[in-house]
Amino acid sequence: MANVKINNISARQILDSRGYPTIEVQITLSNNVFAKASIPSGASVGKFEAVELRDHDTNYYHGYGVTKAVNLINSEIGQKIIKLETLDQEKIDNALIEIDGTNNKSRVGANSILAISLAVAKAAASTLNIPLYQYLGGITAKILPTPLINIINGGMHADNNLDFQEFMIIPHGANSFEDAIRMSSEVFHTLKKILKQKQYNTNVGDEGGFAPNIKDNTEVFDIIIDAIEKSGYKVYKDFSLGLDVAASTFYKNEKYKFSDYQFSTHELVEYYKNIVTQYPIISLEDPIAEEDTLGWKMITKELGDKIQIVGDDLFVTNCKLIKNGIDNNMANAVLIKPNQIGTLTETLNAIRLAQKNNYNVILSHRSGETNDTTISHIAVAVNCGQIKTGSLSRSERLAKYNELLYIEKLLNTSAIYQGML
């Protein structure tokens, strides 16, 4: 398989699940193998994420077009990447970083770079005639992740009055990934019936979860627990709950304002301590704003030995920020979104750093998704044991779950379901 090189790179503009433009790249190799990758985009974006390249022409897709990025891939970037050795992922990714030349990928865009990076990895796996998870993880890749399923959407992911962004069910009591999806589907459909009975709407948000206008967060917990129990399952034993608070979205002037209340950092941490005691919540994502360093230290000290405290906006898949969090005892888990950093190599480095320091790792989608299933393969490749990829509706979310079901079948008796976080 030596000397299989990139022969052609072709990019085009497609639409993501929210109807905004994004990039799809096809890589063709010298052996005529080809592969495609497409890139998601977030609604709730961390301040320190690598930069997407957009057209900013308000007369074209309201400024969200990506024709500049597509043209760069089809010209300057492509010319410098063609003829590179396909199986040397790190060399290709470093070349892409060098072509950009900035510390936040703002010249050619993290979206341009990542589309190429992922397509190269897929083409390399196809060349070796092995699945992507095996190409990236080798024979040790066998853990199917526990899904954190966003069953009710709020915040920036839905047009409703819920302040918290995601209310998740976590099927840690399942015996297999297939079992986890079945159990979660049953709860999802039971929840729909309960919402209808309570005369709440059952429209879905960006990530496929229901988006009812429920004013009180605690009522959401009660309704989800009711759905779990009416589906024949038990909280703590079969399911627990997770929250993506996205606290940066309601943090201003060193105060947190939601549900008609205003909280200091200390008061907010006390609020979390209270709901974690009252409800089966085992994971809190972005419970504190990314710039509230003292708040992160406080909540990790108070709850870090009891539940999973996940940094998303805090870390943005960036090794430097993850190391800072580790050194300062902030959070105990890292959310990984490849488009926050821009290359597969940097993504894998961030995962390794977190795992080496005993931080949990969760692979994650974005609110504006495509049918690309790369994150499913990365999750299994690194044995991270957790994945966030939306609810059990909307095909761009289900594509990832269905790919994991396929991977579980490929692994056969070698497959291990993570279960408890």
Curated annotation (Swiss-Prot):
First-level EC class: lyase
SUPFAM superfamilies found in the cross-reference section: Enolase C-terminal domain-like (SSF51604), Enolase N-terminal domain-like (SSF54826)
Subcellular locations according to the entry: Cytoplasm; Secreted; Cell surface
This protein's UniProt keywords: Cytoplasm, Glycolysis, Lyase, Magnesium, Metal-binding, Secreted
GO cellular component, as recorded: cell surface; extracellular region; phosphopyruvate hydratase complex
GO molecular function, one term: magnesium ion binding
Chief place where the protein resides: cytoplasm
The protein's Enzyme Commission number: 4.2.1.11
Residues annotated as binding (2R)-2-phosphoglycerate: 165, 337, 366-367, 388
Transmembrane segments: none
UniProt KW Magnesium keyword: yes
Superkingdom in the source lineage: Bacteria
Cofactor needs: Mg(2+)
CDD domains (UniProt xref): enolase (cd03313)
Pathway(s) per entry: Carbohydrate degradation; glycolysis; pyruvate from D-glyceraldehyde 3-phosphate: step 4/5
Comment on bound cofactor: Binds a second Mg(2+) ion via substrate during catalysis.
UniProt: Mg(2+) binding residues: 244, 285, 312
One matching Pfam family: Enolase_C
Catalytic reactions of this protein: (2R)-2-phosphoglycerate = phosphoenolpyruvate + H2O
Known function: Catalyzes the reversible conversion of 2-phosphoglycerate (2-PG) into phosphoenolpyruvate (PEP). It is essential for the degradation of carbohydrates via glycolysis.
Family label: Belongs to the enolase family.
Record-given protein name: Enolase
Lineage: Bacteria, Pseudomonadati, Pseudomonadota, Alphaproteobacteria, Rickettsiales
